[in-house]
Structures are given as structure tokens and as C-alpha cells.
From Swiss-Prot:
This is Adhesin P1. Could be involved in cytadherence. Residues 195-208 have a biased composition (Gly residues). Keywords: Cell membrane, Cytadherence, Membrane, Signal, Transmembrane, Transmembrane helix. GO terms for cellular component: plasma membrane. Residues 1-30 form the signal peptide. It is found in: Cell membrane. Residues 259-273 have a biased composition (Polar residues). The gene is gapA. It is a single-pass type I membrane protein. It comes from Mycoplasmoides gallisepticum (Mycoplasma gallisepticum). GO terms for biological process: adhesion of symbiont to microvasculature. Residues 183-209, 244-273, 544-563, 1066-1122 are annotated as: Disordered. The chain crosses the membrane at residues 997-1021. Belongs to the adhesin P1 family.
Length: 1122
């Protein structure tokens, strides 16, 4: 029986195990498949392992300290150390650092991530070597707008970074030798020392190239203005010959000697020639493509590709007129000079120069070198009489980084890395990074596009703009004689801007005949007199006659050497004023050296991506579509030309376009005056244009752009197609007492100058005034900043999640809230200790500043949840993880084995809801089933949601969720507990059957089979055994019966055989005798058998053995087993 039980157990146990295994598979099939959770890497065992940010730094040329990062794990990229850039999360935890000086570490990071997030080296040849980065410094970064895991880093040659110069108040005494003789004075020409600086002239003992010209004035005549003006037409260029620029006849005012010769372009270029830059990688900027993968804790970033930028990439696309040699052999368009010394200056009227140049009119085919954009007047752009891209200009143009889908752009910098007004950006570099393969990183291609061709579509709609004065000198002709150069504050293109790139900058203008002045209406006072009045002066410039009429507009030399000079100027041809269509302006005879006005526009990214690599005259029409709309550009006010002078430069108190449009605005409404009022009047350089930032306006439902201009925050509306040019542009002047100021001073007719922004010496010497090349500021006095602020102290614009914009300076922040402001107020945030950097993190309603001498950061945040005022938290962040938990709490997804199977019995569509803003989130009733969250102590009721960042819609395959909490109106991702990484998690296995269905469906057939087998084994086997035993028993019994029968038969047979026939008769008697003894008849046969000796004894055995058949009953006990 025990053997039978053992056999049954052995038979049933495998079946039971199969059933249990099936049940386990069914249950586990309802659990989530957690694919690639971010929180699985980079976790920290304790909060004490937080990595603090190193010392942050700023690169002024591109206004860069940090980049706010969007995506699954938001935060920032921050310039740190002396050469590096660090990636931090929202709370200051350092995730990784890119150090170009550590090439050994970078070498191991060259490659790509495979499907398993493993860093894999390229199997083929790699065209770059990270060892070339050892001579570079990271100065800027951007995030690819299409792939948030891809960053592009801009690295600059160490040689350029080491040249960064400390800024100073932009006043004359800080830049020029005030006691130098007047270089334009005939008496001083022989002994004058050539100067550098703003003009970039030859240093003492240098070559023969003359210093750049200052600005003699020129009269620009409106076409068909009056009878007097109409008779004044330039002499045909074919009959006139230009004079040598360095001859005694050339009386163009020369710049004064620089106070610091290191600020001259020659010193800055330092022998780094254009040819050397193109061939030596250590002198080139480079863009590095970095791929971030936070699933890989060992290698959180990979160096995927690199592209070196060469100045040749830009020069190769200069228009043909820019690269042609001189046609007249003298590289100038000056024909002659009229010497004049007017003794009858009128007090408070306009500036008049001593020498009046007459210039040859520029034609569309004139080589640029023969206009006033020549090696003499713009030496900073020439090398060996060739218009190229020297070192100073090349480094300046490396800035303004932007990237989308592998197309990377450099829109340029503002040039403030050096104290040279001519350091400006001339165009846009475009680098295409091709897709990588497993074998190679992909090819790169860099081309450059000058702004002269990208902005060639500038035009205006006269019916819409209604210009009161003359259009600005921004128009382009088919010969491309206007050479715009920009001080670029920055660019921005949020995802919602449809690929339109907003450009915030200041821009140079073109001029008439090479002179820096280009107004048609306001010029020296003498020109406002009768248009045909002439004066006569002798060769010394002394007035001989006045008021006499001349029969011709051409000055006539007298026999005594005297010369008649018209009050109206001889340069009567038009200038490059903006026209109603592209490329139909008059050629610009010259180009200003400095930026003249603010300038914003929008460029179309799709067009920039598709532009031909090579610009030619034949395909120039394609480039005219680079602008979103040629009519959509702004100078910060109405599109008029400038007044020649102003006495109200520091009285700029206007905030809006509507205020500037009023008659009370006067000179303040002029675009040139606005730029000067915001910069030079406060001691800033006109190139002091800050970084561009953006906010989404809840009032207008549009983006608003911001950038710093000297001592003011300016706001600009989003530029769109058919956008109204009257859109509001706001100027937020920062606290006036903290910045420098210019005030008018007592003046007389002979001292009508200001030394505030005068880079050039008047031809009449110090007593007659200084002229800066574009706008003349009357006699004034300058008061430096009470805080000692220069552009060096500007640390950048930052924004907060609650739409605050903060201008950060070393000693204070200045905050505005445009969506809430109706009175245009600025709130000051005092910093108890000077700051060295401001770090922008767009996702929080706060930002970070780094105090001087500290390696940690402090928070600038709201005073309280009920207040919009910001304040600096005096406590340094020493534990970023604790700081994070105090703000948003912490959480973690529940282990897969602990999630109830009922969660996966739902369809994805049944557990997802849509919020008012259109985002999909997990239904709140399911959150506790899969996520455990601990809120911050001071905000226990903070709102938590699980954002759907990816899911299958057609099927119920998967859903990916990201935990977020609502902080100050913005949802912020919640990192995994004790980790620097945000955790998004993927779940699969939805629309599963109830937990009991599958186990039951599998178990019931198995149980039935098992029962059947058990019954078959438990009943069938014993029955079979009993039957067999019965058969054996019957066989034995039958055998014994047969034996007995045979024995009995044998006995009877013997008896019969022994009885003879003779005894037959006796037999009845014997039978009868037996019948008489019927009662004892059964026993009687034994008696005779016993008495007989032999024969009768054998039959007796069968007679006793008939009981033997009962023995087969012995197997009967087996029935008890049943």
C-alpha cells in the first residue's frame, strides 16, 4: 500500500508544479515592464554626496554664463573653472563636467550610444581628434531644439580668452589722449603721431596706412526737393579724379591717440594673420556636438562630432564688389576738400566742420575698396589691402549660438571682449552636422553668410509707416555697397515661434559719399539758409565774401586763389535709404564705423537651412528671403533718420512707442538718440547689448523678447508675418542713481562739444568740438555711476517661472514683471555681497547667483508665496539634494512586484485624463498604486501629477510617465529619491485579464486531468489487480476441482473396472444396502477405505481435499485497499 501511495505522489507532483508555474506566469504577466528608468543610474547613497558647482564665469562677447535646459531632467549648463562647462539640475547638483583640458577623459568619450545605452566607439575612421581641444576654452552652449539630449558647445582659442579686456566708463578721457594735437590741423600734420584704437590706424613707426577718418559732414539732398537743390548734381565720375588719401590735400579729421595702445586692432590682432587662422587649428573656434545619456552613469555624455570654424568660410561668400581690387588705384572716393572756417557760429545751432569733402558718387559697379569702406577708413577689416576677416573681427563673430536638428548657427557677438568700437559681427556661420553611423560620426560643412546679403530684403511700406523724416540708411543696392555690422546681443527661437529666429542687436548704417552723417533734413545751421547762397574764402579759410549769388553750384576758384563754397553741400546724390522693395536702394558711398541704432528682426530658419552654400549675383534672390518679412524690422522707434545733434541725450524718460510718437518726444524719438541715451549717456559703449531672453505673455498669448541695452531693459514683441510695426516696444530704465549720467553744461558758440563719446578730433581742434562719427552731443558733463558700474558688472538677464525679468549686476538685481506692470516700474534687489555670476533656470520661480569668492550658490526667490517681490537668500546651498527636497519633495515609483495587478487590467485610454492645457496625465486615483511621494514639509498639499510623456494610442502596449509637482504656477519634474536624475518610467502589459482568470483557465484543465489520472490510477489499478488475483484463484480452484474430479472419476472407474460382469447381479443388493443406511452413508465410504490396505486409500485423499477450492479466497484482503 505504501508503494502505491508513493507512485501516486510521483504522478501528481509534476502536474501540480506545472499548474503553480502557470499561475505564477499569469500573475507576473500583469506586472509592469520597467524599461530604461532614468533613476537606475547616478543614484547617491546619501545626501552628503551632492556635487557643488565650481566657480562660474562669464564670456562678455556672447553674453553667456549659463543656458537653461529643458527636457526630462531640466537644469542648466554653466561655464565653470577656467575652461570647463558643467551640467547641473534645477537645484544645483552637478551631473557632469566637460573639461577640454582633460583630453584623456574626452578621448574615452568619443562615440555614440547603442540601443542598450552603452557608449560605443565608431568602428571606422574619426575625422577629428579631441587633443585639438586642449588649447580651447568653452564660452557658450546651446540645446538642440529638436533633440533635448544633444548640446553644442562653442570653444574659443585660449589666446582670445586671455585677451579679454576689462571695460571702463565710455568717456573720452578713459580712451584717448586729450592733449594730442589736432591731427586734421595743417600746422600739426607734420608732427602728428598716428593713432590706433577706434580707427585701427598704424602705430608709431608703422606702415604708411593712414588712420581712419572721422566724420566730416555731408549734405544729403532729397530728390526734387527745391529748385536750388535740384540744380546740384554731382559731376560725372568719369571726368573727376580722386586724390591720395594721405596727401596734404586730404583734410579728413583723424582720430586721436589711444590712451592704451593694446586696444588698437593691430595690437589685438597681434600678428595673427588671416592666412594663419585658416590653417592653424589652435587659432580657430570649434563647435563640439555632445550627446547626453543619463541612462549611462559611467559615461553620461559622449563626444559625437566636432567642426572647426574658419574665417575663410565667411570671406568666400563676400559679394564680388567686396573682393575686387581698386579701380582708381587710390582706394578712396575723395575728389577734393573745401576749407572753411565760419566765424559766425550761432549759439545752440548745429555742428560745422572745417573741411568739406567732395566725393565721387558710388555706382553699383564701383569696387567697395573705392568707396569709403576702404583700408584707410576701415583698416580693421583689411589685411594687405584685401577686405577679409582679421583676428579681432573673427573672434567677435564667434557667438550667438543656435541649433535645431543638426543645423548649428553662429549669429555673432557684441564685440565687448575688447575695448575697440570696430569689433563687430559681419555675418552668420552655418554648420551642418550630418547624421552619424556606427562607422563614423558624419561629415560637417560650414559656410558663412554676411549680413549684407541676409538683410538685403529690408524695405518699408510707406502707407503703413508714414515716415516723418527720411528713411534710415539700411537699404541695399545690387552692388552690395552697404556693409552692415552688428553688435549682437543674442538670438532666440522658442518652440512655439514656428522656426522664426528673433535677432536682438545694434547695427551700423550706410552714408552718403563716405561721410558718417546721412540726414537729409537736419545738418549744419548754415545749410538752413538760402539754398543758393555762397561764401568765398581764401586759401587759409578766411571769409572773403558772403551772400553773393553764383550762376552755378560748382565752386569757382578765383584768380587770387580764393574759392567759392556753396552753403549747400556738393554731395547731392542720394544715400542708401530704405526703399519699398529689396535691392533698389542707392549705393552707400560709405559705412559708419560704430553701430548707430538698435535693430531687431526675425529670420526664417527654414530658409537659412536651405540657402545655397555659395552666394553669387545669379542666386542672390534666394538670400532676400532669409528675413521673415523684409518690412518687419525695428529700430526701437519710428523709422526715421537722425537729427545731427541733441542736447537731451540724458532726458530719455519715455517707455513706450506711443509716448515716443508724441510731439513732446522731440529728439528722443530718433533711433540714434535712443541708442545714445541708453548707452553713451550712461557711460556705456554702444555695443553694450545684453543677452536675449524670452517670456510667454499671458496677456497677449505671445512671446515677448528682452535684451539689455546699457542701463535699460528693453522688451520687444514677437516678430511675425504682417506684424504691425506700431507694436509696443518698452524701455525699462534701471535705477538712475546707480548709473552714470550726462547733463548739459553752460556753453557758447565756440564750445559746443561733448567729450562723452567723441572718438574723433574735429578738424578745428579741441575748441570746436568732438565728433563721434554719427551723432553730435553738445557740450555736457558726465557723472560716473554711483555704484561704479561698467559693462563688466553686468551679469546677464534671468527670468523666473512667474514671468519676472531680472537684470543682474554685481551689487543688485533690477526686476520687472511686464505682464503685471501698468506703471513700468523697476524693483531693486540689493545683494549684500557682490555676485560674480547669475545662473538662469527657467523652470523655477527663482534663480541662482554666485557670491564673490564662493563656490556654492545662493537663491534669489520670492519673499513669500503671497508676494511678487524677490530677495537674495543669505544662506548658501551646501546640500543641493536637501534644497531640492525642501522645494518639491521626493518620490519613487513602486517596485514592480508591489503594484497591484488590477492596475494593469485597465486600458490605457481609461486611466489617462486630459487637463485644461491639453496635457495628458494619469488619473489621480491611480497615482498611489504606482508612485510613492513625500511632499515638502512646508507645502504638504502640493499638487502631484504623473505626466504622460509617451504612450501607444492605437494599442495598449505601453505608457511612460513623469512625476511632476506644481510650484509657483509651473509644473516641475520630481527626481528619484537620493538621486540627481529625474525618473520617468515605462509600463507595459495593460488591458490584462483579471488576475484569477488565467490561473483558473490554466488550473481547471490540469485539475481535471489530474483527477482523471488519480481516479484511473487509484481505482483502475486495484481493480485490475483483484481481477488478476481472482482469475488466478479461479484457475487454481478449477485446477483442483479438475484434479478432484479426475481422482473421483478414477476411483469410480476403478470400482467399475474391478467389478466383473458376474458380480453385476450383486450390485443392486449392495446398492440397496446402501440405501438402507442413508443417514450414515456419507461416512460409510471411509470405513471400507480405511479397512482396505492399498487401493481404497488413494481415493480417500480426494475425498478430504474438496475444501481446497476455498483457498483462492486468500487474495480477498486486497479489497480493503479500495
Amino acid at each position: 500500500m505504501k508503494k502505491l501511495i508513493f507512485k501516486l505522489s510521483v504522478g501528481i507532483t509534476p502536474l501540480a508544479l506545472i499548474g503553480l508555474g502557470s499561475f505564477g506566469l499569469a500573475v507576473s504577466g500583469a506586472k509592469p515592464n520597467n524599461l530604461k528608468p532614468v533613476n537606475q543610474v547616478g543614484e547617491m547613497n546619501s545626501q552628503g554626496q551632492s556635487n557643488l558647482l565650481e566657480k562660474a564665469r562669464r564670456w562678455r562677447n556672447s553674453n553667456f554664463t549659463s543656458l537653461s535646459i529643458d527636457g526630462t531632467n531640466p537644469g542648466a549648463l554653466v561655464l565653470t573653472g577656467s575652461k570647463s562647462i558643467s551640467r547641473i539640475d534645477l537645484y544645483g547638483n552637478v551631473i557632469w563636467t566637460f573639461d577640454p583640458g582633460n583630453t584623456n577623459d574626452l578621448t574615452g568619450k568619443v562615440g555614440f550610444y547603442d540601443a542598450n545605452n552603452k557608449l560605443t566607439a565608431f568602428s571606422g575612421d574619426v575625422s577629428f581628434n579631441v587633443s585639438d581641444l586642449s588649447s580651447k576654452t568653452v564660452v557658450e552652449a546651446t540645446q538642440d531644439q529638436e533633440d533635448p539630449n544633444v548640446f553644442y558647445l562653442l570653444l574659443m582659442p585660449d589666446a582670445a580668452v586671455q585677451q579679454e579686456q576689462k571695460t571702463k566708463d565710455q568717456v573720452f578721457e578713459n580712451y584717448f589722449m586729450s592733449d594730442a594735437p589736432a591731427a586734421g590741423d595743417t600746422s600739426a600734420e607734420g608732427s602728428a603721431t598716428p593713432a590706433g584704437g577706434g580707427s585701427g590706424s598704424s602705430a608709431a613707426g608703422g606702415g604708411a596706412v593712414a588712420p581712419a577718418a572721422a566724420s566730416s559732414t555731408a549734405r544729403l539732398v532729397e530728390e526734387g526737393n527745391s529748385a536750388g537743390m535740384g540744380t546740384m548734381t554731382p559731376t560725372a565720375s568719369t571726368s573727376e579724379t580722386v586724390i591720395d588719401y594721405n596727401s596734404d590735400q586730404n583734410k579728413i579729421p583723424k582720430p586721436k591717440t589711444l590712451l592704451d595702445s593694446s586696444e588698437s586692432s593691430e595690437s589685438i590682432n597681434g600678428g595673427r594673420t588671416y592666412a594663419n587662422i585658416n590653417t592653424q587649428k589652435n587659432l580657430q573656434g570649434v563647435i563640439v556636438k555632445v550627446n547626453e545619456n543619463l541612462f549611462n552613469s559611467e559615461n553620461p555624455f559622449a563626444v559625437e562630432n566636432m567642426a572647426f570654424i574658419k574665417p575663410k568660410d565667411m570671406v568666400d561668400n563676400y559679394p564680388s564688389t567686396w573682393t575686387q581690387g581698386s579701380a582708381n588705384g587710390k582706394m578712396t572716393n575723395v575728389l577734393q576738400f573745401y576749407k572753411h572756417d565760419n566765424p559766425n557760429a550761432v549759439n545752440n545751432r548745429f555742428y560745422r566742420a572745417k573741411y568739406y569733402p567732395k566725393r565721387l558718387e558710388t555706382q553699383t559697379t564701383t569696387p567697395l575698396i573705392d568707396s569709403s569702406f576702404s583700408p584707410y577708413e576701415h583698416p580693421e577689416w583689411y589685411e594687405g589691402n584685401q577686405f577679409v576677416m582679421p583676428w579681432m573681427q573673427y573672434i567677435t563673430n564667434l557667438g550667438g549660438l543656435y541649433a535645431k536638428d543638426g543645423m548649428v548657427y553662429l549669429f555673432g557677438g557684441n564685440g565687448t571682449w575688447v575695448n575697440n568700437e570696430s569689433a563687430l559681427s559681419i555675418g552668420v556661420f552655418r554648420t551642418k552636422f550630418e547624421n552619424r553611423t556606427a562607422e563614423a560620426p558624419g561629415n560637417t560643412k560650414t559656410v558663412g553668410y554676411p549680413y549684407g546679403i541676409l538683410l538685403s530684403a529690408i524695405s518699408f511700406d510707406a502707407t503703413r509707416n508714414g515716415l516723418a523724416l527720411a528713411a534710415p540708411a539700411l537699404g541695399q543696392d545690387v552692388g552690395y555697397h552697404f556693409v552692415p555690422r552688428l553688435a549682437v546681443g543674442g538670438v532666440s527661437s522658442p518652440r512655439g515661434a514656428n522656426g522664426n529666429i528673433f535677432l536682438g542687436s545694434a547695427i551700423t548704417w550706410g552714408t552718403n559719399g563716405g561721410n558718417f552723417l546721412d540726414t537729409k533734413w537736419h545738418s549744419p545751421a548754415v545749410i538752413e539758409d538760402a539754398p543758393t547762397t555762397f561764401i568765398t574764402v581764401n586759401s587759409s579759410g578766411v571769409l572773403q565774401n558772403s551772400g553773393s549769388q553764383q550762376s552755378t553750384s560748382t565752386p569757382m576758384p578765383n584768380s587770387n586763389g580764393n574759392e567759392s563754397i556753396p552753403y549747400r553741400w556738393t554731395n547731392s546724390y542720394d544715400y542708401n535709404s530704405v526703399r519699398f522693395a529689396a535691392l533698389i536702394s542707392k549705393p552707400a558711398g560709405g559705412n559708419t564705423k560704430q553701430v548707430e541704432s538698435l535693430f531687431t528682426t526675425a529670420l526664417k530658419l527654414d530658409t537659412l537651412n536651405s540657402l545655397p552654400n555659395k552666394f553669387t549675383q545669379e542666386n542672390n534672390i534666394f538670400f532676400s528671403y532669409a528675413m521673415l518679412d523684409g518690412r518687419q524690422w525695428s529700430l526701437g522707434t519710428r523709422k526715421d533718420s537722425t537729427w545731427l545733434t541733441t542736447n537731451t541725450i540724458n532726458n530719455f524718460t519715455y517707455n513706450t512707442q506711443q509716448q515716443l510718437a508724441s510731439t513732446a518726444a522731440g529728439e528722443n524719438a530718433n533711433p540714434r538718440n535712443i541708442l545714445n541715451a541708453l548707452t553713451t549717456a550712461k557711460g556705456f559703449d554702444r555695443r553694450d547689448i545684453g543677452n536675449v531672453d524670452i517670456l510667454y505673455s499671458n496677456n497677449t498669448n505671445k512671446f515677448t523678447y528682452y535684451y539689455q541695452v546699457g542701463g535699460a531693459i528693453t522688451t520687444w514683441p514677437e516678430v511675425q508675418v504682417n506684424y504691425k510695426t506700431s507694436a509696443n516696444i518698452t524701455y525699462y530704465n534701471l535705477t538712475r542713481t546707480d548709473f552714470g549720467s550726462t547733463t548739459p553744461a553752460t556753453q557758447d558758440a565756440n564750445t559746443v562739444s561733448s567729450k562723452l563719446n567723441g572718438a574723433y578730433l574735429s578738424s578745428t581742434g579741441d575748441q570746436q568740438g568732438w565728433y563721434n562719427g554719427s551723432i553730435y552731443v553738445k557740450k555736457a558733463s558726465f557723472t560716473p555711476s554711483s555704484q561704479g558700474y561698467t559693462w563688466q558688472d553686468f551679469k546677464g538677464l534671468t527670468t523666473t517661472a512667474s514671468n519676472a525679468v531680472i537684470s543682474n549686476w554685481t551689487k543688485a538685481g533690477y526686476s520687472i514683471r511686464p505682464d503685471d506692470d501698468t506703471v513700468f516700474s523697476v524693483s531693486k534687489i540689493p545683494f549684500e555681497k557682490e555676485i560674480t555670476a547669475a545662473v538662469n533656470v527657467r523652470s523655477l520661480d527663482s534663480y541662482y547667483v554666485q557670491l564673490n569668492g564662493e563656490t556654492s550658490v545662493n537663491t534669489v526667490a520670492r519673499v513669500s508665496p503671497d508676494s511678487s517681490a524677490l530677495t537674495l537668500n543669505p544662506k548658501r546651498i551646501t546640500n543641493p539634494l536637501m534644497n531640492r527636497d525642501n522645494v518639491i519633495g521626493q518620490g519613487a515609483f513602486i517596485s514592480r512586484n508591489d503594484i497591484p495587478s488590477s492596475f494593469f487590467e485597465n486600458k490605457i485610454n481609461d486611466i489617462v485624463t486630459t487637463e485644461a492645457d491639453g496635457t495628458e496625465v494619469l488619473d489621480s486615483k491611480y497615482i498611489n498604486s504606482i508612485y510613492r511621494y513625500t511632499p515638502p514639509q512646508n507645502n504638504p498639499h502640493i499638487r502631484l501629477r504623473l505626466l504622460v510623456i509617451d504612450r501607444s494610442r492605437a494599442t495598449n502596449d505601453f505608457i511612460k510617465l513623469l512625476p511632476q509637482v506644481l510650484v509657483d504656477g509651473e509644473y516641475v519634474a520630481v527626481p528619484q529619491a537620493n538621486s540627481v536624475f529625474v525618473s520617468d518610467q515605462e509600463f507595459t502589459g495593460f488591458d490584462a485579464l483579471p488576475g484569477y482568470v488565467l490561473p483558473v483557465a490554466i488550473s481547471i484543465p490540469i485539475i481535471i486531468i489530474a483527477l482523471a489520472l488519480a481516479l484511473g490510477l487509484g481505482i483502475g489499478i486495484p481493480m485490475s489487480q483483484n481481477r488478476k488475483m481472482l482469475k488466478q484463484g479461479f484457475a487454481i480452484s478449477n485446477k483442483k476441482v479438475d484434479i478432484l474430479t479426475t481422482a473421483v472419476g478414477s476411483v469410480f472407474k476403478q470400482i467399475i473396472n474391478r467389478t466383473s460382469v458376474t458380480n453385476i447381479k450383486k450390485t443392486p443388493q449392495m446398492l440397496q444396502a446402501n440405501k438402507k443406511d442413508g443417514a450414515s452413508s456419507p461416512s460409510k465410504p471411509s470405513a471400507p477405505a480405511a479397512k482396505k490396505p492399498t487401493g481404497p486409500t488413494k481415493p480417500s485423499a480426494p475425498g478430504a481435499k474438496p475444501t481446497a477450492p476455498a483457498k483462492p479466497k486468500a487474495p480477498a484482503p486486497t479489497k480493503k485497499i479500495e
